[in-house]
Amino acid sequence: MIEPHGPRAKEIVQRDCNIISPCLSRPYPLVIERARGATITDVDGKAYIDLGAGTAVMNVGHSNPEVSAAITAQLEKMAHGDFSSFFANPPVRLAEKLKQLTGYDRVFFCNSGTESVEAAIKLAMWKLRRQSLVGFYGAFHGRTLGSLSLTCSKIKHKVHFPTIRVVHAHYGYCYRCPLRLEYPDCGIECARQIETVIFKRELSPKDTAAIVVEPIQGEGGYIVPPPEFHQEVRRICDENGVFMVADEVQAGCYRTGTFMAMENFGVRADIVCMAKALGAGLPLGATLSSSAIMDWPPGTHSNTFGGNLLASAASLAALQFMEREDLGTRAKHLGDYFMTRLRELQSRYPAIIGDVRGLGLMIGVEIVKPDGSMDPDTRDRIVVEGFKGGIVLLPCGDSTIRFCPPLVITEEEADTGLDRFEAALKNLSLEK
């Protein structure tokens, strides 16, 4: 790890290393003290443009006044209402809001993305009385054992851990097609192989509860599939009596311009998982479905903190803010601006930037060697150079940098952040 920015940061990092479990991955020693909007300030007073939004969590911006006020007002009444045992208004209001935004009329609350996926897995297995799943190479759905079975982005996530039965298919990664085909002439063979290969040779659809898929692969590299990919997955689910589960944990809450990213592809899943931006900084996850599917009896599934009153109040305020401020339209507008600037940089640095892809403010920049192969080392150096220059960048996939700033980022902040990103590229290109 590089040297922390200042003395307070250095001291806190040292204490952290002495006490916190070493399993966490930190790309650089940023020690945050406060943040507002799209600006983070560290413990030594240095400010950074946040292009990561706490891993796509702070869509409404850090320290959003309306969210803060809602949390404070609820805290003065009660923090935890034991929603798994009793009743309360805040989580019910939140569920009603989610129904209005999505059309799903049943909601299960939990605390995180991985828990929302676990609930989706259990619901699909319970409803269809089947125990197997189909996932995708490059997917990330969490690190608890059920969701980890679906996760297939890095082997270090899975080594030594038992898993439930999941067969993985190829995702629609057209820039590096694993089947060495060309879109659109490929006929979406990656998705078709679920039916033509997996369901014929390895896993009967009669034993399959669900196909679980991200609208855009997140940790796998911010990979945007062609529209027909999800449409083909939907067809396969329909024709084989299998549920389609959409993991909207990272892509949801207007990040791609629509409340649910699957809307961009004209597809509606049977079960939806949400978290991250849903809680506006507080731990909150939700699993959504229809009343026809989510009809499991009391005691089938539960958790102590699901429907937490503070998280529910924060989420409702955040959703109301997103809707009123039309953050979906803003994400599309600023996303177009980011994509234009980043593609200009790609044309100037073709030996470093291989691909720019995204929807709304969920954008991936794939870093390559001059021969076009992945270059994770240079990717990591760019991320660190960005930190030194005052921007927060996050890696994903094998060789990609993600751009997922708060949806409230100003154009001036966006320009500053992109200028600093270009400076990082320039520094490394001069070294080469």
Which residues are covered by each model-predicted region?
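Conserved N-terminal phosphate-binding loop of PLP-dependent enzymes in the Aspartate aminotransferase
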Residues: 1-432
